[in-house]
Amino acid sequence: MAFLFKKKVRGIYSLYMGENKKIDGVSTRVKSKYLGPLYRFKEYFADELFKIEHIKHYEYGLSSALRQIMDQFLFQKIFQNKIKKQTEDNYIGKLILLMVMNRLADPCAKYSLQRWFNGTDLANTFDMPAEELEAHKVYRAMDKLDEYAEEIETEICKTILIQENISLNMIYLDFTNQETYSRNHDSELLKNGHNKRGHDELLQVNLSLTCDSNTGIPFFHKSYPGNYNDKQFIKLYTEELRTKLDALGYTGKNTLIIDRGINGDKDFELLRQNRFDYIGGLIQKEFPKYFEIPKSKLRNTHIHKRETKEDVQIKYASANEKIYGKEHLILTLYNVESYGDKVEALGISLKGYKEACEKQLQEFKKEIEEKTFQSHWNNIDKMKNKLKEINKELYPLLRFKIKSYRFNLTWEISENKKEYNKYVDNFGKYVLFTSRLDLKPKEVIELFYGKKKIEKNFHYLKSNGYTNRYLRMGPMLHSKDERIRSHNYTCVLALQIYQIINHRLKKKELDMSVQDVLDELKAITYYHIKIPGQDEPIKHVNQLTQKQKEILKALEVEL
């Protein structure tokens, strides 16, 4: 429970708010907040013996800052104006705003939004009754958001581009998926597919995302069936993405930076038809000659600088050649750091494969001894084929010397050094290509390694409560397609604000993570202290630290 107490420091009494919890059956103070010098509160008390009816404290700093930032980009007005044409609900814009804000401030289930709202100072200042956050009203708002999502997305993207001075000439496009525990097999979105976190047994929905190449702020998104691969989706989405960019005024060409999952002559022809240039990756199976270039012939060097890790040295060679029916700039890269990581991972995989083969051979040996001529495994070629089935990719990297004499099976497994060296020679190699012949090789490399920006967006969305306390997409329990799309969009809207905060921190050279900033703002609390004989409670915000003041200035908000 919360209570007030006074404390003497250097001869001066100050007022504090304390909070106790029972620990091992003993009431122990676990939190205290400085409210100010005691003399400031003298008029509210008859004497130094405080008589208080109750104390309420509300989260204030984070919710207030988020509200101001979202107002700067006209979120609430856009929600209300786009949806209100078809509904008489005067609170619909505010309700959607709160859903987005919650994804950043304290992600919770939709039926818990009212509890979260009542714990913030929004309950005292936001012109909306808390009853509007009842679950059935929230779900109705989600349905409306889905109905008008495309119009809303266009308007919000326009506002962000203008206010943050961002260009979409260069765009990252990537895809992820989110599993769900829903069992709606009639859904058009929820399907079984290759899950990036290994939960292939669960239904999932796919999500595409685009972001600019400089700030990493996301712009366009799309939820689509969980069993679609990248090549299937790009065929459906290319024209739609072109339409979205045209609506923002990009009537010329844009450059897409894409993953190697998109490949093939028809895919890139489709991109060109829709006024897209591209930077992508070639796959070894289709273009082996570029991967076979010896490392000794990669004579150019580029140093890629990173924010949190050591710089990376990249060796490369480049050439202009015709592929996919058009001349492209092609670069073969070698990343020393990536090579070491992959060799280490291969060693672990080979060890596991060798152990699996040993176990299988032991089973062959046992059966041959027991069944003699009746055994199915009297043929060594059959045994080798079975070992190959365990892992076809790693099988050539080992030598198997297997002998069977008088129903006694013996074997020896060793490394095939020639095949091993050939296999690892491609580790750390990437082959990039681009239709932008005006770009220099080093510019292409920087743009390729800049894809970390969009990968971080997915990392933020799909993190759990241990790796990221804010902005979580899952667990997703919705089963109706319109609510799945709406939930995903509220997460993307929250991600836009998250990355805008990150962008502003970098502009002001404030060396803090967004998570740390949100934590600092969340610590700013509004106290309401009710005193007998006073109609209105005493309202007090805890004193801001210097760090909190710097954060608010960087984010361009005031409390």
Which residues make up each language-model segment?
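An anionic, glycine-rich sequence signature occurring as long contiguous blocks
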Residues: 220-223, 274, 279-447, 514, ...
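Conserved nucleotidyltransferase catalytic core and NTase-mimicking acidic/glycine-rich helix/loop elements
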Residues: 500-528
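Catalytic or ion-translocation cores adjacent to nucleophile or general acid/base/metal-coordination motifs
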Residues: 223, 227-239, 244-253, 262, ...
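Dynamic "connector" segments at or just before major functional cores
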Residues: 1-191, 210-229, 235, 243, ...
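Short amphipathic alpha-helical "interface-anchor" segments enriched in bulky aromatics
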Residues: 441-477
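Short glycine-rich loop/turn motifs
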Residues: 203-208, 427-431, 458
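Short, conserved catalytic/metal-binding motifs centered on acidic residues
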Residues: 17, 113, 169-178, 216, ...
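Secondary-structure transition/capping motifs at alpha-helix termini
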Residues: 23-24, 120-124, 149, 164, ...
